[in-house]
Amino acid sequence: MDTRMRPSALGFVAVFAALSAFAVPATAQDLTGTLKKVKDTGSISLGHRESSLPFSYYDDNQKVVGYAYELCDKLADAVQAELKMDKLERKLVAVTSANRIPLLTSGGIDLECGSTTNNLERQKEVSFTLTHYVTATRFVSKKANNYKSLDDLKGKTIVSTAGTSNIKLVTGLNTERNLGMTIIPAKDHADAFLMVETDRAAAFAMDDILIASLVAVSKTPDAYVISEEALSVEPYGSMLRKDDPAFKKVIDDAMLAMFKDGTIEKLYDKWFMNPIPPKNVTLNVPISAQFKKVIANPTDSGDPKDYAD
């Protein structure tokens, strides 16, 4: 039997092979960056906070909960679906404001699920998801002291959390305005608030939603006041490794779908407008005009000007 193919048959085989190359889904060998790491290990490492209520924190049972954490869990579902994996282990890694970026860039975590401000300086080191919250830097103090503005804190001791954009901002304003404040870095938000609670600091400068949450679950919420003066606009996003476009596309596409189908509003309502652990306190913080703008026109911009009313 003559097993040689005619030229026309050879041409058909070549065309079929070429088309098949496009039709076959990507294999583990085709994957790069975080997607390859997740596929190879069967797990995704999620960096969470310990006391960033209501975004990412421990409840009374030491279970990680929160708005940003639940959002990240849904994003992990999207990664699992993209990679066609039957199961995907979530490895939970506690991070702080000071170590979250080093842990991400070194591969210790794959996606950071906390309360991190997306700004142009951080974008030099990492990438961000689409913005999932917009807040502002303010300070909390004891109502009895009647501190209305940053200028009222001249010569006082101020605390902020180490490794945050807030402590850098307040340090800069302290110099610019010649306020002579003593600025102390705290390990985390809970420790910083405790310093105000115990009169070791006159005020705690941080994102308003975080300090509002700490006040709400404190022993005497009525004893504190949050400044009306806003020192900066702070858009939140979850961090992922820089220069990893395939992973970012999966994450961004999943978030776009949640913005479109109303999932993001449902998550927001759950964590900001209803009772939350550990004390079943309702924060009662409606969606801001800035965040409504983001939901309508999603962005990962780190420029505060893009979040103006």
Model-based region annotation:
Residues Q29, N166-I183, D222-A223, L256-D309:
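Ligand-binding clefts/hinges and TM-proximal coupling segments of bilobed small-molecule sensing domains
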Residues E50, Y133-S141, A216-D252, N274-N297, ...:
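Periplasmic-binding protein-like
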Residues D73, K84-D152, K292-G302:
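Acidic, polar ligand-binding/catalytic clefts
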